[in-house]
């Protein structure tokens, strides 16, 4: 597979860009997750970074990427509303894996946001989307800019939701390469990887949580619920980080 220049790809039309990336994705599907990370670091233009919410299975990507490049910046967008167990999990994994952690937050504090806008997460889809833009999307863009990121690693998996079922391993989102090494992994493969490296699930896993975000928009799993229904009251699956709005040159996939 050829080396890819971001500037060259961004000069193409959406259709040309998508076709070019599709050719590479066919080959990436044949590689292991570890081989994909190595390929990305050797063949994609720009500085790497890994975004992590330190959710249920976060240790997988943190181990996978830092084992190959130990000083990779780890980006956390902290809303201020994470579970206490999440903050403890962040400290645990940062110490265990010697992570190069970078924390980014919204320009307005949680209390200031509530004073100005009320509890956005109680204001339907529109309120949730505004909340996510303020607390997740804008801080993430600032992180990508300040760290001069060209390769954005993420741990999204197709099995997690319908909105992720057709994602490619490699795309362009918000002007950078988006790379998903474990996209095709199953829950069983995740479990075996964590077991092999003696890595923990998030502490709330044992309390019945399948997915963990903010305290006010995360629900414990109950019989009959899908994983998607445990977040954002079932109104949304994505927090906005992984949705390309097209403003900064994305492949639209």
Curated annotation (Swiss-Prot):
Keywords: Cytoplasm, Oxidoreductase
Catalyzed reactions: [thioredoxin]-disulfide + sulfite + adenosine 3',5'-bisphosphate + 2 H(+) = [thioredoxin]-dithiol + 3'-phosphoadenylyl sulfate
CDD domains membership: PAPS_reductase
Pfam families: PAPS_reduct (PF01507)
Main subcellular localisation: cytoplasm
Active site: 239
Domain of life (superkingdom): Bacteria
GO biological process, alphabetically ordered: hydrogen sulfide biosynthetic process; sulfate assimilation, phosphoadenylyl sulfate reduction by phosphoadenylyl-sulfate reductase (thioredoxin)
Claim: Cytoplasm is one of the keywords in the record: yes
Keyword Oxidoreductase (UniProt): yes
Localization annotation: Cytoplasm
GO molecular function: phosphoadenylyl-sulfate reductase (thioredoxin) activity
Entry-linked InterPro entries: PAPS/APS_Rdtase, PAPS_reduct_dom, PAPS_reductase_CysH, Rossmann-like_a/b/a_fold
Pathway: Sulfur metabolism; hydrogen sulfide biosynthesis; sulfite from sulfate: step 3/3
Its EC number(s): 1.8.4.8
Gene Ontology CC entries for this record: cytoplasm
Function: Catalyzes the formation of sulfite from phosphoadenosine 5'-phosphosulfate (PAPS) using thioredoxin as an electron donor.
HAMAP family hit by this protein: CysH (MF_00063)
Family stated for the protein in its record: Belongs to the PAPS reductase family. CysH subfamily.
Protein's name according to its UniProt entry: Phosphoadenosine 5'-phosphosulfate reductase
Species of provenance: Aliivibrio fischeri (strain MJ11)
